[in-house]
Amino acid sequence: MVIGAFRCETQQFRYDVLDVKYFRHPRFRSKEYLKQASEIVFQLLSKLELGKDERIQVCRGYIFDEAVESLKEMYGDDRIERIAVTGEPQRLTEIAYMDEIRNLGYEPVKERDEKKAKSFFHMMNWLRNNPEKLIYAKTGWPRLQRYHLFRSYRPRQTRE
């Protein structure tokens, strides 16, 4: 998952990737991805070198709830605002995401935003044809277990 940070005034953009391991069993179930997303948000804001009274707008997505609570504790309620990300920040984050998945060898369907189901099955078929890439798939969602491809995937247990 790509997390982006954008400063409108200067058009600065930074991003980082939330490791897929947080979206697999057992980490997914314990929601470790929330803490990691929060850490990435703080790292990105540090790289942007926030001004003393600069407002911070954060995507309304659930994954940022923990980050927002920590930001409010650190900067105060008045500086933090939840928003629907659109425009240039959305475009740049989407480009970063596309670059990351293309680096894995996957070419997404062109109309992926309009046809989410088609996009999902396109990616699932790509994984079926490239099983070595399953290590990059977010397999923690219980509903994915209805698909044979994900039922048969058992990640190696590692200590991290």
Model-derived segments and spans:
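RNase H-like, Mg2+-dependent phosphodiesterase core
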Residues: 1-160
